[in-house]
């Protein structure tokens, strides 16, 4: 595993502990979910797969949940927003749309 980008210096043990304690795949979140990102890590696995982990703090409960995705579109959108805003403390809204061919796409917009 090779860390490509991160919002702060993460100890690998800390990163994996957070990911394993409370882990959700972004594709399993309901439509119109607001993701309140407090930290971010993108890494490449040993087999070359790129994965992004968003550390989400629930506004209602204060619970920290890690949300993982390997979607290149989501990763590119998030990193463009981070570069533009200059911060990793951002909120994104997840929505889904369907193509004419029936494929479901996840949209990831800055709130």
Regions found by a protein language model. Give the residues of each.
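Polar/charged alpha-helical tracts
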Residues: 13, 17, 63, 76, ...
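Short nucleic-acid-contacting surface segments enriched for D/E, G, S/T with interspersed K/R
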Residues: 28-33, 74-93
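Surface-exposed beta-strand edges and their flanking turn/coil or helix-capping segments
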Residues: 50, 68-69, 79-83
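Disulfide-stabilized netrin-like
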Residues: 58-76
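Compact mixed alphabeta submodule
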Residues: 82-111
């Amino acid at each position: 595993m090779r860390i490509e980008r991160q919002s702060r210096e993460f100890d690998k043990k800390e990163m994996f502990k957070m990911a394993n304690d409370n882990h959700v795949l972004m594709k399993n979140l309901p439509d119109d979910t607001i993701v309140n990102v407090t930290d971010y890590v993108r890494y490449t696995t040993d087999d070359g797969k790129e994965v992004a982990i968003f550390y989400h703090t629930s506004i209602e409960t204060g619970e920290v949940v890690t949300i993982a995705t390997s979607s290149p579109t989501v990763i590119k959108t998030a990193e463009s927003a981070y570069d533009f805003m200059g911060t990793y403390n951002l909120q994104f809204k997840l929505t889904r749309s369907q193509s004419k061919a029936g494929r479901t796409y996840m949209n990831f917009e800055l709130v």
